[in-house]
Amino acid sequence: MGRAMVARLGLGLLLLALLLPTQIYSSETTTGTSSNSSQSTSNSGLAPNPTNATTKAAGGALQSTASLFVVSLSLLHLYS
């Protein structure tokens, strides 16, 4: 009974780790585009680079996914 509960907890954490970064990515890109549209046109020398924003969001999402995956594996190893 204990192993089944730990397995469910681990799978739940893994599912959360897979779904949470997509929500973080979508909220970061939404706020990034809204702040870019409100900028004045006087700063024409510096154009925003959407590639960097996407890379940073994907990197953060990957890091949080990897962290939660390691935590779930550690819990499974500890309680198995």
Curated annotation (Swiss-Prot):
Entry keywords, A to Z: Cell membrane, Glycoprotein, GPI-anchor, Lipoprotein, Membrane, Signal
Tissue expression pattern: B-cells. Expressed in a number of B-cell lines including P32/ISH and Namalwa. Expressed in erythroleukemia cell and small cell lung carcinoma cell lines. Also expressed on the surface of T-cells.
Post-translational modification: Extensively O-glycosylated.
Disulfide bonds listed in the record: none
Pro-sequence residue ranges: 60-80
Glycosylation sites: 36, 52
Quaternary context: Interacts with LYN and FGR in a cell-type specific manner.
Noted disease: Multiple sclerosis: A multifactorial, inflammatory, demyelinating disease of the central nervous system. Sclerotic lesions are characterized by perivascular infiltration of monocytes and lymphocytes and appear as indurated areas in pathologic specimens (sclerosis in plaques). The pathological mechanism is regarded as an autoimmune attack of the myelin sheath, mediated by both cellular and humoral immunity. Clinical manifestations include visual loss, extra-ocular movement disorders, paresthesias, loss of sensation, weakness, dysarthria, spasticity, ataxia and bladder dysfunction.
Sequence similarity: Belongs to the CD24 family.
Name of the protein in its database record: Signal transducer CD24
Source organism of the structure: Homo sapiens
